[in-house]
């Protein structure tokens, strides 16, 4: 998963941030990175704001996280405190072997 958003109410976003990790873990997710100063090296679609990257073991786990009533309730704080540019499900490559 890759998300890009602008935080306009840090207090509301902090409520979301505190509850995010337990729900992520509940669905087998892992957090990779956050960057408030990413740099576009090529292309016209410059990304500004916060970029967050996290993953799940499979698509089913990602969709279960998204549909989880606990997450949906928590996400109201993110919606109130940020302007979401995108939250994108990226399909991973199949195992090689």
What are these regions (language model features)?
Residues 79-97:
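C-terminal end-helix/capping segment
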Residues 30-32, 74-75, 86-89:
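A short linear hydrophobic-aromatic micro-motif
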Residues 1-69, 91-97:
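Short S/T/G/P-rich N-terminal loop/turn motif that feeds into the first structured element of a domain
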Residues 62-63, 70-83:
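C-terminal structural segments of small proteins and small subunits
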């Amino acid at each position: 998963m890759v998300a890009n958003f602008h935080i306009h109410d840090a207090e509301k976003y902090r409520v979301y941030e505190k509850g995010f990790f337990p729900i992520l873990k509940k669905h087998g997710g892992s957090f990779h990175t956050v960057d408030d100063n990413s740099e576009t090296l090529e292309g016209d679609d410059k990304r500004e704001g916060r970029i967050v990257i996290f993953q799940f073991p499979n698509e089913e786990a990602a969709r279960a996280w998204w549909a989880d009533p606990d997450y949906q309730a928590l996400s109201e704080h993110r919606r109130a405190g940020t302007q979401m540019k995108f939250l994108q499900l990226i399909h991973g490559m199949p195992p090689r072997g």
